[in-house]
């Protein structure tokens, strides 16, 4: 069963592409990144040039794909989208690059998952707008250079640290996307409700935003699920009590925690005395992949002060003990982390 509060894209999310803003003026939040992009886009348009290459990084579900599409719309060009795992061979990338028009945007999601061989092809394409193609094999092999139209590469990643330095250094614009505030998410929920013709009261929107883990993708997904409850049990209007009742039935608490979040936290607290405990040990204890815990679950728990990362492992904070109704051990036993 798919988690309702997963920040990753689900089939349900793909249906509601109408919720994506098409212009920077309609994009809510990320003011710093948005302000910088507006300046760079305006300058590129005035010069009649392609926008410099852009790297967007941050936790999943914060709008990296949406921003890539907005960049193309604001520049008045086409966008071609792909992802790192899909580009398996240099020939795959060459086929994409040679079909670009001048100033087009090439969006590569999960760019940190590009293979080293494919990256080598990308370097001259980004820097010199040239494609090096090797013809033949062995001593008779030769390299020919193909000129490419000047294009903009927009890369998106949740793990910027895994990008190689040569690739990262070729991006002229690097922006980190942050978790959204409750006020920003309330605005997003209200806008989405209007587009979907959902009746929602201000307090209902605020309560829904508060449980959305700082992530617009989750907010929009919860909005659709709560809408179902409202239509069946509350005359179709989303109020704060309707949000509370429906999310309780979906096992999402007032902090936005679901069953997996509680499993991780209670494993650290109950099985390992609050930590420190290694990530591999946690993964084995709950039957989940290490990378999934680190990339999907941990950012939210750390952001809200429920887990501390230490050289010796993960440690549950006093806030975590209080939230789950457990008695915290003396500070000294947790390395004075409280």
Curated annotation (Swiss-Prot):
Function per UniProt: The RuvA-RuvB-RuvC complex processes Holliday junction (HJ) DNA during genetic recombination and DNA repair, while the RuvA-RuvB complex plays an important role in the rescue of blocked DNA replication forks via replication fork reversal (RFR). RuvA specifically binds to HJ cruciform DNA, conferring on it an open structure. The RuvB hexamer acts as an ATP-dependent pump, pulling dsDNA into and through the RuvAB complex. RuvB forms 2 homohexamers on either side of HJ DNA bound by 1 or 2 RuvA tetramers; 4 subunits per hexamer contact DNA at a time.
Enzyme class: hydrolase
Residues that hold ATP according to the record: 19-20, 61, 64-66, 127-129, 170, 180, 217
EC number: 3.6.4.-
Stated family: Belongs to the RuvB family.
Residues binding DNA, per UniProt: 290, 309, 314
UniProt domain comment: Has 3 domains, the large (RuvB-L) and small ATPase (RuvB-S) domains and the C-terminal head (RuvB-H) domain. The head domain binds DNA, while the ATPase domains jointly bind ATP, ADP or are empty depending on the state of the subunit in the translocation cycle. During a single DNA translocation step the structure of each domain remains the same, but their relative positions change.
UniProt source species: Geobacter metallireducens (strain ATCC 53774 / DSM 7210 / GS-15)
Cellular localization per UniProt: Cytoplasm
The protein's assembly and partners: Homohexamer. Forms an RuvA(8)-RuvB(12)-Holliday junction (HJ) complex. HJ DNA is sandwiched between 2 RuvA tetramers; dsDNA enters through RuvA and exits via RuvB. An RuvB hexamer assembles on each DNA strand where it exits the tetramer. Each RuvB hexamer is contacted by two RuvA subunits (via domain III) on 2 adjacent RuvB subunits; this complex drives branch migration. In the full resolvosome a probable DNA-RuvA(4)-RuvB(12)-RuvC(2) complex forms which resolves the HJ.
Catalysed reactions listed for this entry: ATP + H2O = ADP + phosphate + H(+)
Spans annotated as Head domain (RuvB-H): 254-338
Residue ranges of the region described as Small ATPAse domain (RuvB-S): 181-251
GO BP term (any one): DNA repair
GO molecular function, one term: four-way junction DNA binding
Primary location: cytoplasm
UniProtKB keywords: ATP-binding, Cytoplasm, DNA damage, DNA recombination, DNA repair, DNA-binding, Hydrolase, Nucleotide-binding
Cited SMART domains: AAA
One Pfam family cited in the UniProt record for this chain: AAA_lid_4
Top-level lineage group: Bacteria
Lineage, uppermost ranks: Bacteria, Pseudomonadati, Thermodesulfobacteriota, Desulfuromonadia, Geobacterales
One GO CC term, this protein: cytoplasm
Protein name (record): Holliday junction branch migration complex subunit RuvB
Residues binding Mg(2+): 65
Region (Large ATPase domain (RuvB-L)) location: 1-180
